[in-house]
Curated annotation (Swiss-Prot):
Its main location: cytoplasm. Keywords: Chaperone, Cytoplasm, Stress response. The gene is grpE. This is Protein GrpE. It comes from Alkalilimnicola ehrlichii (strain ATCC BAA-1101 / DSM 17681 / MLHE-1). Residues 1-21 have a biased composition (Basic and acidic residues). SUPFAM superfamilies: Coiled-coil domain of nucleotide exchange factor GrpE (SSF58014), Head domain of nucleotide exchange factor GrpE (SSF51064). Belongs to the GrpE family. One of its GO terms (cellular component) is cytosol. HAMAP family: GrpE (MF_01151). Pfam families: GrpE (PF01025). InterPro entries: GrpE, GrpE_coiled_coil, GrpE_head.
Amino acid sequence: MSDKQREAERQQSEDKAHSEAESAEAGQAPEAQAAEDGAESASGDSGDELTELQQALEEARARAEENWNECLRARAEMQNIQRRAQADVEKARKYAVEKIAGDLLGVKDSLEMGVKAAKEEGADPQKLLEGSELTLKMLSQVLERFNVQEIDPQGERFNPEHHEAVAAQPSHEHEPNTVLNVMQKGYALHDRVLRPAMVVVSQKAPEPPPSGSIDEQA
């Protein structure tokens, strides 16, 4: 083989290798571009997810702040309600007897006039009695308006919830534990006893001795 032939074969081999290299590079280029495009797409998706997460976080923070502010407002309102309720209770306790005190002023005025009249020279006892009875009637009316009832159990059966026995007397005419005498009236407010009535109650009297027993002893 001549030198020219060998040179031609070498040149042909180089051209073939160069052509194959170019073909390989051309085949790798789309793959590299696809990989680069995929990386860019993945990066874009990650960025979108991060943006969405940040937006969701901001919305959650805003809702949390709104809920906290509502909680603070509710607590402040509750404290105001408690203060108003406490003030109302204190006011009710302080002025609980305001109405009855106002009604009792008329009774006091009547008593003062009666005392003044009694001190005058030549005071008429009958008029003083009438004035006292009128004052007592006024007081009874005031008590009735406030649901204060008398406990006057004359002749009734003894009730330990409303009466207090201060003495007992034998009696043939009454059943045992009958109220014989009311020493002091009691009073009740609605169903609550303010003061029990002080009473004398009956007890069973001893049986009289059989008739004729004295004659037999004599």
